[in-house]
């Protein structure tokens, strides 16, 4: 894409800023993802125009200096940032001003110039500013070249579109700006104030007028409180106590040298401040989410069938998911639901697809498109919706994809099992015939034998009961006692006390009925759900088998009295001697 192919661009670089960056480029006709390096080819070709128009640089700067500057450090660094690279390319693709270009046969050549970072900032699309800011801190030897590129852009453009970090696309389809009456944010050093929604202008003001760069502004949860904090701190101590200093024009005379200051989370105080702001923001989000959970005054209209819903927000969300297959997530994972639904409704009112965001001529065409293309859903890569999901507020600087992709198995493996807080509770098994409880099963067996003349261990041994038969027998006795019925004579009594008196007087506790009476499938189910006695029963069959194996298997000890004679008469020893004689 040559510079002459771009339509609608001013020729004068002072009016355009950078030639080949903005213009009336048509929207792509296909819906597939463009290749990453196709976009890099576009970036590189447009970035070359920066080199063509460096004649307007400040005094003492030559275009040859920029053209000859080494980009190897930048290239190596960016090759290691392939993930950030692909993310930026996806963002560029979603911008409606870009179109597909031929694939370059040598894609890595587009990494040889640092100017493409500046171009990405100027395009106004979402881009990972962290790359540019890390470059400032890591590439000290290239800092002069890097800041000369910045200066070239600032001095070359009189437009107000030149900003420090990437622009965000409008949050609403109409492209409206900030609400009137939004709080203003002061400059860190002077009395200039800017509306909260125009923080880009404040950042531009601070870097031009005061030569200070704030790293990773997008990761600051509360920008206004962040600025107010450092405004106070800079009045207490010099800026050099907090910021890294980068000197440009180092070879020029001293009066022409400039110092730029980088404020980033490498400073522990800045890191702590960002984390505290993030925690405060998370608390506000969770409080808002809890209010929405308990809110019963919600009123909303379905975006697809115009049916009205009142009560809790979950009623409307569940309706759209069930009836229209439009699922934006669980209600408990969403915050600011009313604003979220309003944003989606405005897109549909503007005849815009919720997934690919194409605009159609009428509502029927839009409905057919969303149905056939299965676009009745939101695009998870659209960062516009991130602020409506709680997961994006959990960790500082991490998106929902990064949080979900983390593998916690390694962390679980590294954690040692800690049993220091383990408390051993007594068994508290209950007698079969009365309410007596014992802490050990042995004591309970003794109690039933002495008090009720019921020897469960003897019965188990005489009848050869396995574990499952013991379970049936215990459950059978429990049920009969619960029904106040004697299992031997089948007489029913008014109370358990009368039943115990009868069974003890008649010695019926030890007179079990026939096996077919209690050895039934129905007695697999416990009479009492918390019957601890069932958990202490042993498998007599396995115990007996193990005991028989121990008794029947003979153990023959090794005879070591004739060990020397065995060695001399062994076949192996004879073969070895025969081999030696033959050799």
From Swiss-Prot:
Disulfide bonds: none annotated. GO terms for molecular function: RNA polymerase II cis-regulatory region sequence-specific DNA binding; zinc ion binding. Its main location: nucleus. Pfam families: zf-C2H2_2. Coiled coil: none annotated. Induction: Down-regulated by oxidative stress. Gene3D superfamilies: Classic Zinc Finger (3.30.160.60). A zinc finger (C2H2-type) spans 351-375, 482-508. Keywords: Chromosome, Cytoplasm, Metal-binding, Nucleus, Repeat, Transcription, Transcription regulation, Zinc, Zinc-finger. GO terms for biological process: cellular response to hydrogen peroxide; regulation of cellular senescence. InterPro entries: ZN622/Rei1/Reh1_Znf-C2H2, ZNF277, Znf_C2H2_sf, Znf_C2H2_type. It is found in: Nucleus; Cytoplasm; Nucleus, Nucleolus; Chromosome. It comes from the Eukaryota. One of its GO terms (cellular component) is nucleolus. Belongs to the ZNF277 family. Probable transcription factor. Involved in modulation of cellular senescence; represses transcription of the tumor suppressor gene INK4A/ARF, perhaps acting via the Polycomb group (PcG) complex PRC1. Interacts (via zinc-finger domains) with RPS2/40S ribosomal protein S2, perhaps as nascent RPS2 is synthesized during translation; the interaction is direct; the interaction is extra-ribosomal. Interaction with RPS2 competes with the binding of RPS2 to protein arginine methyltransferase PRMT3. Interacts with Polycomb group (PcG) complex protein BMI1. May be part of a complex including at least ZNF277, BMI1 and RNF2/RING2. This is Zinc finger protein 277. The lineage of its organism: Eukaryota, Metazoa, Chordata, Craniata, Vertebrata.
């Amino acid at each position: 894409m040559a510079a002459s192919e771009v339509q609608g661009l001013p020729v004068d670089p002072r009016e355009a800023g950078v030639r080949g960056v903005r213009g009336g480029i048509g929207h792509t006709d296909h819906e597939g993802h463009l290749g990453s390096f196709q976009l890099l080819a576009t970036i590189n070709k447009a970035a070359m125009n920066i080199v063509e128009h460096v004649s307007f640089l400040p005094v003492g700067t030559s275009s040859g200096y920029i053209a000859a500057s080494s980009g190897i450090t930048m290239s190596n660094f960016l090759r290691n940032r392939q993930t950030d690279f692909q993310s930026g390319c996806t963002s560029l693709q979603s911008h409606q001003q870009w179109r597909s270009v031929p694939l370059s046969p040598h894609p890595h050549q587009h990494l040889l110039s640092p100017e493409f970072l500046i171009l990405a900032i100027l395009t106004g699309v979402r881009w990972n500013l962290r790359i540019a800011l890390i470059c400032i801190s890591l590439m000290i030897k290239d800092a002069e070249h890097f800041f000369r590129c910045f200066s070239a852009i600032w001095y070359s453009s009189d437009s107000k579109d030149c900003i420090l970090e990437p622009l965000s696309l409008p949050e609403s389809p109409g492209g409206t700006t900030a609400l009137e009456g939004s709080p203003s944010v002061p400059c860190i050093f002077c009395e200039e104030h800017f509306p909260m929604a125009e923080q880009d202008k404040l950042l531009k003001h601070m870097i031009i007028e005061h030569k200070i760069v704030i790293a990773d502004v997008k990761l600051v949860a509360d920008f206004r409180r962040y600025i107010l904090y450092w405004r106070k701190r800079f009045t207490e101590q010099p800026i050099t106590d907090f910021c890294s200093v980068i000197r440009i024009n180092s070879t020029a005379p001293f009066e022409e040298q400039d110092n730029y200051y980088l404020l980033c989370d490498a400073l522990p105080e800045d890191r702590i401040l960002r984390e505290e702001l993030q925690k405060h923001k998370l608390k506000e989000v969770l409080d808002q989410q809890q209010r929405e959970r308990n809110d019963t005054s919600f009123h909303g209209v379905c975006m697809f069938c115009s049916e009205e819903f009142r009560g809790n927000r979950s009623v409307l969300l569940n309706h759209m998911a069930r009836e229209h297959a439009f699922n934006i997530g669980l209600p408990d994972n969403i915050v600011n639901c009313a604003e979220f639904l309003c944003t989606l409704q405005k897109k549909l009112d503007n005849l815009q697809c919720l997934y690919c965001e194409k605009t159609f001529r009428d509502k029927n065409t839009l409905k057919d498109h969303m149905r056939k293309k299965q676009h009745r859903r939101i695009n998870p890569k659209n960062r516009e919706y991130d602020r409506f999901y709680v997961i994006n507020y959990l960790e500082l600087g991490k998106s929902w994809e990064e949080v979900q992709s983390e593998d916690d198995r390694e962390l679980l493996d590294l954690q040692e099992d800690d049993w220091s807080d383990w408390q051993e509770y007594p068994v508290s098994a209950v007698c079969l015939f009365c309410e007596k409880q014992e802490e050990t099963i042995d004591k309970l067996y003794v109690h039933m034998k002495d008090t009720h003349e019921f020897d469960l261990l003897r019965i188990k041994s005489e009848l050869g009961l396995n574990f499952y038969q013991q379970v049936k027998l215990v459950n059978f006795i429990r049920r009969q006692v619960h029904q106040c019925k004697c299992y031997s004579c089948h007489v029913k009594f008014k109370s358990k006390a009368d039943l115990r008196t009868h069974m003890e007087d008649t010695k019926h506790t030890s007179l079990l009925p026939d096996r077919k009476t209690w050895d039934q499938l129905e007695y697999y189910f416990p009479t009492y759900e918390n019957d601890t006695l069932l958990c202490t029963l042993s498998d007599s069959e396995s115990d007996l088998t193990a005991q028989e194996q121990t008794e029947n298997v003979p153990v023959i000890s090794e005879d070591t009295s004739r060990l020397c004679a065995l060695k001399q008469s062994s076949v192996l020893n004879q073969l070895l001697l025969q081999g030696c004689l033959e050799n």
